[in-house]
């Protein structure tokens, strides 16, 4: 039996969105779910205990970054990421593919793998499907991702086709190299850029490899929202209904809701932590740039409808003061609130699916948030 399994609980009659539960060796989590990103074995500014307080059920960490610092051997010696960072709930690690391919001029792609230079010190390294499986095995996450090539946007058809075909061959090599199947589940990643024919081909080829879960990669890389939704419209239905469906690197409120409507179960993004550190907060009435002068005497809470620790205890004026002064507490408070906002949003999405009202919820949320469909 696979280490990670999916249980479908309900399908929304209004939209077709899925309410489910993913079971892992470190516990279960309800879906659709947003996963906070802990790139270097930490969600920036948040302790594991604080993540539990905001009800984060699963977090993501990054293979590329943990391989470079502190190194897979140190993490393995600590008992994997769970022991190293004192987190006893599920963890997902990406394969590092996106980071390696983002290095652009610092890397070279061959059929064997990718040769790249560290962004830290320029040292030379090689990632192959086999070496990435070895690293992810040592990191010890419950869900590990196959090593894939993420094509840029825009990209020519011929380039994307070759890239997608290589990703499929690498996925097969990853599956052959992954032996720790009782403790970890390996997910395949559907690629193909913005080309329908290639997405369909990728999905069908990966389904033949029978992974315990599937992800859609190569989206939210600069394409317009309507193109991303179009790709989801024809790709998500091709993914097995009895396995988790993961949309990689997506985390704005509208993307989360639209992804759920299209049958996606799992999402991750650095957005809430990154914009939080820059002084932007997510609220039920849209984004608030808290460093703006107009909030200097605003003693109301960040979001009038939020009951998180930050909103219960601190004002906009105080948080603006902290951010303007470069105080670490300010960055922690905005990060805390933003993560809570998205985790709570997904709770509302799950309830709306249960009530068969997700489309209605979307319309009400968009109206208040300031989105247009």
UniProtKB/Swiss-Prot annotation:
SUPFAM superfamilies, per database record: tRNA-guanine transglycosylase
Active-site positions, per UniProt? 94, 268
Q: Which UniProt keywords apply?
A: Glycosyltransferase, Metal-binding, Queuosine biosynthesis, Transferase, tRNA processing, Zinc
GO MF annotation, one: tRNA-guanosine(34) queuine transglycosylase activity
Q: What class of enzyme is it?
A: transferase
Q: Has keyword Transferase?
A: yes
Which domain of life does the protein's organism represent? Bacteria
Pfam families from the xrefs?
TGT (PF01702)
Q: Which residue ranges does the record annotate as region RNA binding?
A: 249-255, 273-277
Per UniProt, where does Zn(2+) bind?
A: 306, 308, 311, 337
Purpose of the protein: Catalyzes the base-exchange of a guanine (G) residue with the queuine precursor 7-aminomethyl-7-deazaguanine (PreQ1) at position 34 (anticodon wobble position) in tRNAs with GU(N) anticodons (tRNA-Asp, -Asn, -His and -Tyr). Catalysis occurs through a double-displacement mechanism. The nucleophile active site attacks the C1' of nucleotide 34 to detach the guanine base from the RNA, forming a covalent enzyme-RNA intermediate. The proton acceptor active site deprotonates the incoming PreQ1, allowing a nucleophilic attack on the C1' of the ribose to form the product.
Protein name in UniProt: Queuine tRNA-ribosyltransferase
Identify the species of origin. Answer: Ruminiclostridium cellulolyticum (strain ATCC 35319 / DSM 5812 / JCM 6584 / H10)
């Amino acid at each position: 039996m696979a280490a990670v399994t999916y249980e479908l609980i309900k399908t929304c009659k209004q939209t077709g969105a899925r309410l489910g539960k993913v079971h892992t060796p470190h516990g279960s989590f309800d879906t659709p779910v947003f996963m906070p990103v802990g790139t270097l074995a930490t969600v920036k500014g948040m302790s594991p205990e604080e993540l539990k307080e905001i009800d984060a059920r699963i977090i993501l960490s990054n293979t590329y970054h943990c391989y470079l610092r502190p190194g897979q051997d140190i993490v393995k010696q600590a008992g994997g990421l769970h022991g190293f960072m004192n987190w006893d709930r599920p963890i997902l690690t990406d394969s590092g593919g996106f980071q390696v391919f983002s290095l652009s001029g610092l890397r070279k792609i061959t059929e064997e793998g990718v040769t790249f230079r560290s962004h830290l010190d320029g040292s030379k390294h090689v990632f192959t499907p086999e070496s990435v499986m070895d690293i992810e095995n040592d990191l010890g996450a419950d869900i590990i991702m196959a090593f894939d090539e993420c094509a840029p946007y825009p990209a020519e058809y011929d380039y994307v086709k070759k890239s997608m075909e290589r990703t499929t061959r690498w996925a097969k090599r990853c599956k052959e190299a992954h032996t720790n199947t009782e403790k970890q589940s390996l997910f395949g990643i559907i690629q193909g850029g913005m080309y329908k024919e290639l997405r369909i081909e990728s999905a069908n080829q990966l389904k033949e490899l029978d992974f315990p879960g599937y992800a859609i990669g190569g989206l939210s890389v600069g394409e317009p929202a309507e193109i991303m939704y179009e790709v989801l419209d024809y790709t998500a239905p091709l993914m097995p209904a009895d396995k988790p469906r993961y949309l990689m690197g997506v985390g704005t409120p509208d993307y989360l809701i639209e992804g759920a409507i299209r049958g996606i179960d799992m999402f991750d993004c650095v957005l809430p932590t990154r914009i939080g550190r820059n002084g932007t907060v997510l609220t039920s009435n849209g984004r608030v740039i808290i460093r703006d002068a107009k909030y200097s005497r605003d003693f109301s809470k960040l979001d009038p409808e939020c009951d998180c620790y930050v909103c219960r205890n601190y004002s906009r004026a105080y948080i603006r003061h902290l951010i303007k002064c470069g105080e670490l507490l300010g960055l922690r408070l905005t990060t805390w609130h933003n993560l809570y906002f998205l985790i709570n949003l997904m709770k509302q999405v799950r309830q709306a699916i249960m009530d068969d009202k997700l489309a209605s919820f979307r319309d009400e949320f968009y109206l208040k948030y300031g989105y247009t469909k």
